[in-house]
Swiss-Prot record:
Its EC number is 3.6.1.66. One of its GO terms (cellular component) is cytosol. Mg(2+) binds at D68. The active site is at D68. GO terms for biological process: nucleotide metabolic process; purine nucleoside triphosphate catabolic process. HAMAP family: Non_canon_purine_NTPase. One of its GO terms (molecular function) is dITP diphosphatase activity. Substrate binds at T8, S9, N10, I11, N12, K13, S69, F155, G156, Y157, D158, K177, H182, R183. This is dITP/XTP pyrophosphatase. Coiled coil: none annotated. Keywords: Hydrolase, Magnesium, Metal-binding, Nucleotide metabolism, Nucleotide-binding. SUPFAM superfamilies: ITPase-like.
């Protein structure tokens, strides 16, 4: 059994990732109270930052992986981007709940004709010997004109993101979402990479 340590404390990410990386002989462990300041300028930099921090915490002896992801909107100069999780504080200097954050995006997009947006995910994996591999995934879509208040699934910006078949991410169950999402695509690449080293 190979144990991988996932550098996150986000329960939503943990649930999505555990479903995708459901591989026999691989166990995913979550560190307790893991919280690293994301000071990178790109998704890749932030992902590496988290992976390297956890690798160091585990005395450079355990395989670790991390991911950084976010929403990039063309009409907003690719914001929220790396600030997706804390866009409220970046833009307004105060903390908002998920619905309020989605309202902020809808308001900023009110006069915009170009509603093209992308969800981007970068995974960084550090093996026991210190070798680093990165995996990327992207989902293209558009920003909706309003919020799905009846969301049954998803989290974050899912209620305002329309996929190319005009469905909100919040309308999809976890299995459906993982088949098309940025995170699903990136972790599928990571999964294929890991499978090479299993008996």
């Amino acid at each position: 059994m190979k144990t991988l340590f996932f550098a996150t404390s986000n329960i939503n990410k943990i649930n999505e990732v555990k479903q995708i990386l459901d591989i026999p002989k691989i166990k995913i462990e979550i560190p307790q109270n893991f919280d690293i300041k994301e000071t990178g300028k790109t998704f890749k930099e932030n992902s590496l930052l988290k992976a390297k921090a956890l690798f160091k915490i585990l005395n450079n002896k355990q395989p670790v992986f991390s991911e950084d992801s976010g929403l990039c909107i063309e009409a907003l100069n690719m914001e929220p981007g790396i600030y997706s999780k804390r866009y409220d504080q970046y833009k307004l200097g105060k903390k908002l709940d998920n619905n309020e954050k989605n309202h902020l995006i809808i308001d900023l997009m009110r006069e915009k004709n170009n509603r093209t947006a992308y969800f981007i995910c970068v995974i960084s994996y550090i093996d026991v010997d210190g070798t680093i591999n990165n995996f990327e995934g992207m989902l293209k879509g558009t920003i909706a004109l309003n919020i799905d208040y009846y969301q049954k699934n998803g989290f974050g910006y899912d209620p305002i993101f329309l996929t190319t078949n005009n469905k909100r991410l919040s309308e999809l169950n976890l299995e459906e979402k993982n088949k098309i999402s940025h995170r699903g695509i990136a972790f599928d690449k990571f999964k294929k990479f890991l499978m090479q080293f299993l008996d």
